[in-house]
From Swiss-Prot:
Sequence-specific DNA-binding transcription factor. Represses transcription at least in part by recruitment of the histone methyltransferase EHMT2/G9A and histone deacetylases such as HDAC1. Regulates hematopoiesis-associated protein-coding and microRNA (miRNA) genes. May regulate the expression of proteins involved in extracellular matrix development and maintenance, including fibrillar collagens, such as COL4A1 and COL11A1, connective tissue components, such as HAPLN1, and molecules regulating cell migration and adhesion, including EDIL3 and TGFB2. One of its GO terms (molecular function) is transcription cis-regulatory region binding. It is found in: Nucleus. It comes from the Eukaryota. One of its GO terms (cellular component) is nuclear body. GO terms for biological process: cellular response to leukemia inhibitory factor; chromatin organization; methylation; mitotic cell cycle; negative regulation of DNA-templated transcription; negative regulation of transcription by RNA polymerase II; positive regulation of transcription by RNA polymerase II; regulation of extracellular matrix organization. InterPro entries: PRDM5_PR-SET, SET_dom, SET_dom_sf, Zinc_finger, Znf_C2H2_sf, Znf_C2H2_type, Znf_PRDM5-like. It is an enzyme of class 2 (transferase). Widely expressed with highest levels in colon and ovary. Tends to be silenced in breast, colorectal, gastric and liver cancer tissues. The gene is PRDM5. The lineage of its organism: Eukaryota, Metazoa, Chordata, Craniata, Vertebrata. It comes from Homo sapiens. Keywords: Activator, Chromatin regulator, Disease variant, DNA-binding, Metal-binding, Methyltransferase, Nucleus, Repeat, Repressor, S-adenosyl-L-methionine, Transcription, Transcription regulation, Transferase, Zinc, Zinc-finger. This is PR domain zinc finger protein 5. It is linked to Brittle cornea syndrome 2: A disorder characterized by extreme corneal thinning resulting in corneal rupture after minor trauma, blue sclerae, keratoconus or keratoglobus, hyperelasticity of the skin, and hypermobile joints. Residues 8-124 form the SET domain.
Length: 630
């Protein structure tokens, strides 16, 4: 299942155009930015029928315009965060359009979108295409536009999915497949209710214009009232059920009478009746009608195939926030499982290597690496793998294909996630501000680490071998490998071993030539972000490291450390031949050349005198021959 992870630059809130959650911008989005790809199950067009909900479906076409398949994101287990982008009520309100690249669907910003704006999808019309040609967005659109398969897209669904939308709304541009759906649309969005038609909450008296809004409110209102009225809850003397409000209790009493001993178990009904015949009549009248009408979500009107699937679907309208990192989940179980990642406890150990884990299932998955059975063999290097996903990731290290390109610096990446992570370096907006100082950050987790390290001096994970402390347990585990010499990660190009995936990843760039970190001032690129940061200081002349003795400043910490030795007289680099000591390692290396009988000598072209170092030769030519080095 694809988790409902939402990138930091977006947030989930109640939609302004439909019931349920919508996707909003957490920062300004520029025209031409692209998001995706859209995730969903692949379905063939012939598997669809006109009773299905098309709002979360996209059609994927081949090079000749033929329909290859339908991407269906109806099931949250097979979708991603783009499922929360709703159809724009009209073309004027859209700020995104769908495009197809290869067999992937992406969402393209067709205008600059301000912060805290709901993202609404539409289709590209001819005016939009002409405007794109003028403003270079066509560099993003390589395979042509994708038509919208959602319910309100009148230009898309008529030709592709065989559903005629003959019932047009007189208030907006929407059209629908039946008069009943049109009537529901008018009542929900356009009709102002009369006093007698308002839907009123029996708990608090609050009124709502539509029934769906009331149903959502009741879930929250009942939970609040249960806390306030827990001391005076209402309990049924027949079945011992408790209720937080008198109205709910009275409604229950009508169905739960002492003389009603026949219980209806259909669809979790629970109604009690006096006789077997009454139960039979009830089931025929209530539970054997048109099943399609009973399996419709009251929030988004999605039609489900069974009561259990409807119950599962309703969970997507409940969003559970992690209070530690603000990630969002669609079920309490997912959130509970995620919270383990924030815990310091690792109670489950592997009895073979004593490695500890936070979850028992992780131990089971880990034990496979100790088994000799490694069914996934790499055909290129012969390396075996116990897990299929690890094998698939390994195969990518042999591939030169990088289909995902950054539009800012043209860097290429193998996966959408790698590209998305890289794009953070181009985002100039830092939305997370430290309350202790003026520092700002692009991600909240980076801000949290800053506060812990700088302001709280909070490094609670300490190495028992060297007493060095770290902010997170993962960094401590990586550090410990420097003591044990453990190097599990092997470079597929040269066989060199590394202690962590991060150092291996940086090393592999020396083989592939990948330099994803581009200098904004010049054309120079770097394989590591630290290298880029230090290089940028050559443009900005920034020297943040100052000597406390003489106020001399340096652009790198290493330069400051070397300079301090001129004040302390410390010379930690000693020659093992003649015991001379030096303050810098490069000075020791240069000195050792004098002990090498086979060393290359620098020769004067005028008098053929030889010198052990080039700088000695330069001084000689300047003083003796009057030739300055150019």
């Amino acid at each position: 299942m694809l988790g409902m992870y939402v990138p930091d630059r977006f947030s989930l809130k109640s939609s302004r155009v439909q019931d349920g959650m919508g996707l909003y911008t957490a920062r300004r989005v520029r025209k031409g930015e692209k998001f995706g790809p859209f995730a969903g199950e692949k379905r063939m067009p012939e598997d669809l029928d006109e009773n299905m909900d098309y709002r979360l479906m996209w059609e994927v076409r081949g090079s000749k315009g033929e329909v290859l398949y339908i991407l269906d994101a109806t099931n949250p287990r097979h979708s991603n965060w783009l499922r929360f982008v709703h159809e724009a009520p009209s073309q004027e309100q859209k700020n995104l359009a769908a495009i197809q690249e290869g067999e992937n669907i992406f969402y393209l910003a067709v205008e600059d979108i301000e912060t805290d704006t709901e993202l609404l999808i539409g289709y590209l019309d001819s005016d939009m295409e002409a405007e794109e040609e003028e403003q270079q967005i066509m560099t993003v659109i390589k395979e042509g536009e994708v038509e919208n398969s959602r319910r309100q897209s009148t230009a898309g669904r008529k030709d592709r999915l065989g559903c005629k939308e003959d019932y047009a709304c007189p208030q907006c541009e929407s059209s629908f497949t039946s008069e009943d759906i049109l009537a529901e649309h008018l009542q929900t969005l356009h009709q102002k209710p009369t006093e007698e038609k308002e839907f009123k909450c029996k708990n608090c008296g609050k009124k709502f214009p539509v029934k769906q809004a009331l149903q959502r409110h009741v879930l929250q209102c009942t939970a609040k009232s249960s806390l306030k009225e827990s001391s005076r809850s209402f309990q049924c003397s027949v079945c011992n059920s408790s209720f937080s409000s008198a109205s709910s209790f009275e409604q229950h009493q009508e169905t739960c009478r002492g003389d009603a001993r026949f219980v209806c178990k259909a669809d979790s009904c629970g109604k009690r009746l006096k006789s077997k015949d009454a139960l039979k009549r009830h089931q025929e009248n209530v539970h054997t009608g048109d099943p399609k009408k009973k399996l419709i979500c009251s929030v988004c009107n999605k039609k489900c195939s069974s009561a259990s699937s409807l119950q599962e679907h309703r969970k997507i309208h409940e969003i559970f926030d992690c209070q530690e990192c603000m990630k969002k989940f669609i079920s309490a179980n997912q959130l509970k499982r995620h919270m383990i990642t924030h815990s310091e406890k690792r109670p489950y150990n592997c009895e073979i290597c004593n490695k500890s884990f936070k979850r028992l299932d992780q131990v089971g998955a880990h034990k496979v690496i100790h088994s000799e059975d490694k069914p996934y063999k790499c055909k290129l290097c012969g390396k075996g793998f116990a897990h299929r996903n690890v094998y698939k990731n390994h195969k990518k290290t042999h591939s030169e294909e990088r289909p995902f390109q950054c539009e800012e610096c043209k860097a290429l990446f193998r996966t959408p996630f790698s590209l998305q992570r890289h794009l953070l370096i181009h985002n100039s907006e830092r939305t997370f501000k430290c309350h202790h100082c003026d520092a700002t950050f692009k991600r909240k987790d980076t801000l949290n680490v800053h506060v812990q390290v700088v302001h709280e001096r909070h490094k609670k994970y300490r190495c028992e071998l060297c007493n060095k402390a770290f902010v997170t347990p993962s960094v401590l585990r990586s550090h410990k490998k420097t003591h044990t010499g453990e190097k599990e990660k092997i470079c597929p190009y040269c066989g060199q071993k590394f202690a962590s995936s991060g150092t291996l990843r940086v090393h592999i760039r020396s083989h592939t030539g990948e330099r994803p970190y581009q200098c904004p001032y010049c054309e120079k690129g770097f394989s590591k972000n630290d290298g880029l940061k230090m290089h940028i200081r050559t443009h900005t002349r920034e020297k943040p490291y100052k000597c406390s003795e003489c106020s001399k400043a340096f652009s790198q910490k290493r330069g400051l450390d070397e300079h301090k030795r001129t004040h302390t007289g410390e010379k930690p680099f000693q020659c093992d031949v003649c015991d001379l000591a030096f303050s810098l390692k490069k000075m020791l290396i240069r000195h050792k050349m004098t002990h090498n009988p086979n060393r290359p000598l620098a020769e004067c072209q005028f008098c053929h005198k030889k010198f052990t170092r080039n700088d000695y030769l330069k001084v000689h030519m300047d003083n003796i021959h009057g030739v300055a080095d150019s």
